[in-house]
Amino acid sequence: VCLVEVVRVAVGRPLLELPAGTLDREESLADAALRELAEETGYRAGRLESVGGFWMSPGILRERMHLFVAGDLVAGPQALEPGEQIRTRHVAWDDAVTMCLDGTIEDAKSVAGILLTDARRRRPPSPSR
């Protein structure tokens, strides 16, 4: 798993997170995922799979996260915005799951994304309807 380490001013320290970002006007969800992955990590994905989505805090926000898993990655340079400081950190899948469970990864979207993906990978495929 390629995580990013980003200093979050509101928290006052760096957090480990999945690469993420905002959707540009007229941009598809998949295109946004590919763009953010490339900008933050430098990786270009040859394959992208939608895992699903979830509301972050529906009682107060309309923010919805859409989760994708990228594959067939090709390394390249990051394309950070001015002032952005993002370090990449590679960890094994099982280690990322453990980091969510032990509190090392504290970012809600990352915890939800990693654990949701892990749960779906471990379940047998459901029969077609």
Predicted regions and their residues:
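Conserved Nudix-box catalytic region and its N-terminal flanking loop in Nudix hydrolases
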Residues: 1-35, 39, 73, 77-78, ...
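A contiguous pocket-lining binding segment that forms or flanks enzyme active sites
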Residues: 26-71, 78
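Residues at the C-termini of beta-strands that transition into short coil/loop
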Residues: 5, 71, 92-94
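Nudix hydrolase/Nudix homology domain
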Residues: 10, 14, 25, 50, ...
